[in-house]
């Protein structure tokens, strides 16, 4: 693939320790005659192979299905990954961010953000919390107190 060739060249010429894709659904595999779900599956597998071949982590940001917006409980789950179950299958880790304050400004802790490790092939799953600092567009350590 084009991205694989560019990454290999960069690793050889300058070094490459990490690749971040922002975001997966904007990529094209160049495959014709296939549906979008098949294309995203191919892209996901290609990124997994590239990560293994180059020996580096590849982080791919992905959209969620719109069905999340229609549910009462908005916290994402693995089946919410958009356009492909292969993203979940190929990934070594799947991490979601969830902030109740995004959906409900009247919640008790609108800046409390959950980092949810939903899949970790070589470790434990679980959650941690950060504080969203919207005016700076960044996260900070969660103080455990209301903000």
Residue ranges, per PLM feature:
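VWA/integrin I-like adhesion module and closely mimicked acidic/polar interface patches used
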Residues: 38-40
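Conserved H-loop
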Residues: 61-63
């Amino acid at each position: 693939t084009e991205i694989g060739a560019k990454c290999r060249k960069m690793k050889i010429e300058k070094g490459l320790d990490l690749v971040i894709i922002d975001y997966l659904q904007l990529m094209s595999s160049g495959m014709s005659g296939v549906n979008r779900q098949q294309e995203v599956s191919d892209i996901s597998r290609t990124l997994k192979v590239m990560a293994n071949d180059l020996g580096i982590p590849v982080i791919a940001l992905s959209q969620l299905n719109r069905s999340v917006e229609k549910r009462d409980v908005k916290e994402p789950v693995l089946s919410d990954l958009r356009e492909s179950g292969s993203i979940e299958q190929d990934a070594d880790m799947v991490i979601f961010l969830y902030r109740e304050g995004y959906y409900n400004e009247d919640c008790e802790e609108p800046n409390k953000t959950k980092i949810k490790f939903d899949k970790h092939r070589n470790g434990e799953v679980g959650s941690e919390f950060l504080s969203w600092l919207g005016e700076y567009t960044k996260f900070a350590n969660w103080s455990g107190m209301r903000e």
